[in-house]
Amino acid sequence: MVDTMRAALDDGTGQYVVRDVPMPTEFNGSVLLRVRQAGICGSDLHMTKLRNEGEALPSGHEVAGEIVELPSGDYDDYGLNVGDRVAIEGIGGGRACTKCRFCQYGQWKHCMDLAPETGGGFAQYMTRRAAGLFKLPDSLDWVDGAIVEPMAVSVHGLHYGRMHPDDVVGVVGSATIGLSSIAAAKAFGARIVIASARYPQQAEAARKMGADIVVGTGPGEFEDACMQASSGVGADFVVESVGGHQSDSFHQAVRATRNQGTMLYLGGVKIPMKFDLFEPLIREIRIQSAICYGVLDGRHDYEVAIDLLASGDIPYREIVTHQVDLENIQDGFDAAWDKSSGSIKVQVNV
């Protein structure tokens, strides 16, 4: 085995430099993986604006790859073998101790004894534990494998937030997570899905994912559409999928939710914001936060996401508008930022 690999690292200015780095560190129970595909997430974009020094380890968490080496031990429970193609859950399960209070019921994201971070998917190799590796069926290729992660985020949010069949569902934003939320909501039986979209390519994709009503992002457009679709009541379940360095989407989602409905806070607003907590109190709105994935109702969200993608009923891979090689990853980040390029999801071929 070689001692070095190619990896892309933010130099601290938001520019990615591809260079030789040491192979990822092994740890107790770690599996060596050859990365094949990695998606550029909105959080990857936002982090380029927040860093003031270069990365020590590669990032990238929307990842699919191939098992190169398994550590000694019994892996029958996982059904894994060298050469298997897997979607890699690297945030929780891939580092989880599997023994603590949270791991005992499959909430690996909240593990109290996570293994050290050894680097993400913007590199040729990764190390993660077997609990975070999910085999891909033959019908899914590497492109599909690297969109399992964002689909699992929405699966987790809708399950954890307790969306019900026949709900009127609103989705604020039609970027990657908004689009997976639209698709998952329809798959889980939503009666009507209303979505907002900022860019033409997002609006088109929202319709392909199953949105019944797609509106722009002008003041009141989304809220009005949710009211009209629900006979003036408001949506039963609203997903805030935007987050980032703004808070308008959070306020929109609350306003569009009916009394005693649920607002799923999925996007992650990264700035301080003012919010009147009296409104959800008086209206008895449940604001439910959700992040990442875990085991719910006996199945991991990655497993459900893989089944949805393998069903052939959801054209989610069509959100992948651009692909670049690892050596040209900066071109991928540039395209992801520039929505005039038609970009939705940019993936890196590793």
Predicted regions and their residues:
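NAD(P)H dinucleotide-binding glycine-rich loop of Rossmann-like/cofactor-binding domains
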Residues: 92-172, 314
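Mid-domain Rossmann-like dinucleotide-binding core that forms the NAD(H)/NADP(H) cofactor-binding site
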Residues: 140-219, 224
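Glycine-rich cofactor phosphate-binding loops and adjacent beta1-alpha1 units
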Residues: 161, 204, 208-286
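C-terminal substrate-binding/catalytic core of Rossmann-like NAD(P)-dependent dehydrogenases/reductases
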Residues: 271-322, 330-331
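C-terminal capping/lid region of NAD(P)-dependent oxidoreductase domains
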Residues: 2-3, 216, 232, 268-269, ...
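Glycine-rich beta-strand-centered segment in the early N-terminal region that forms part
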Residues: 24-38, 50-99, 137-139
